[in-house]
Amino acid sequence: MDLRQFLMCLSLCTAFALSKPTEKKDRVHHEPQLSDKVHNDAQSFDYDHDAFLGAEEAKTFDQLTPEESKERLGKIVSKIDDDKDGFVTVDELKDWIKFAQKRWIYEDVERQWKGHDLNEDGLVSWEEYKNATYGYVLDDPDPDDGFNYKQMMVRDERRFKMADKDGDLIATKEEFTAFLHPEEYDYMKDIVVQETMEDIDKNADGFIDLEEYIGDMYSHDGNTDEPEWVKTEREQFVEFRDKNRDGKMDKEETKDWILPSDYDHAEAEARHLVYESDQNKDGKLTKEEIVDKYDLFVGSQATDFGEALVRHDEF
């Protein structure tokens, strides 16, 4: 068993051992918050800094001089200007904010990429992934470990094929990212729904009924009363999840549940930053306009609100 499989087994066993009957499993995929700060520019630009840079990177700018902040911001602007036309649009800024907020995903992909691109050709084939992930456990399975690795491999192969847009069974880094984090890609949402339904639909009728829905979240322990949140979830299923009132959720109803259409915080923040910085009101930003408003975007030791040191107690 390779390290990845060992860690997979360990995490699953640990989760099982530590789980409690009243714990709630959350299958809903929400967009992450841009910041846990209050968005009030009259008091501080902390929210904007977190949104533009990501919370961890924002802390590093709090320790820079204004000159250093402007220099680093200028380099960031060059990355945001995707088409290299000298302007930053709302869409380019929105894409950057989403990248900054999901940087951990790309870091995770980089870590896994190194372990799966076995021939180091800049691509990961299905054979490479299968051999790196399942090779040992399929050749020498442990009958006592409780995991059906063949079933897991079939499921992974189906997801890999879905992520692989050109159908050559060889993933680019973008396709590999879609494979590892399908909830982040519109074209992968159907596979997220399918896998979720397979996990919950115990009688394999292609639907999720009320008892399956509750059973996935809550394991009843003896004669104890149901927690209040379980009663609330029963009501949620009847009133909101099961839209056509047939007593079960189909694929579309399941999709609405686990992949809700959230308010686009990244787009709202991008529009806000453009509005505040667009001096000539042409609807897009030059590097000069952004750097002139560096205190809004990134801050420094000498911003309007003067944070000379990182405030460790806030994080």
Curated annotation (Swiss-Prot):
Lineage top rank: taxon: Eukaryota
Give start and end of each EF-hand domain.
Answer: 68-103, 104-139, 151-186, 188-223, 229-264, 265-300
Q: Which InterPro entries match?
A: EF-hand-dom_pair, EF_Hand_1_Ca_BS, EF_hand_dom
Binding-site residues, Ca(2+) 6: D278, N280, D282, K284, E289
Task: Kindly state the positions of the motif Prevents secretion from ER in this protein.
Answer: 312-315
Q: What positions are modified (Phosphotyrosine)?
A: Y47
- What keyword terms does UniProt attach to this protein? Acetylation, Calcium, Endoplasmic reticulum, Glycoprotein, Golgi apparatus, Membrane, Metal-binding, Phosphoprotein, Repeat, Sarcoplasmic reticulum, Secreted, Signal
Q: Which residues does the record give as Ca(2+) 5 binding sites?
A: D242, N244, D246, K248, E253
Signal sequence annotation: 1-19
Q: Which residues carry this modification: Phosphothreonine?
A: T65, T254
For this entry, the protein name equals Calumenin
Organism per entry: Pongo abelii (Sumatran orangutan)
Q: Which gene encodes it?
A: CALU
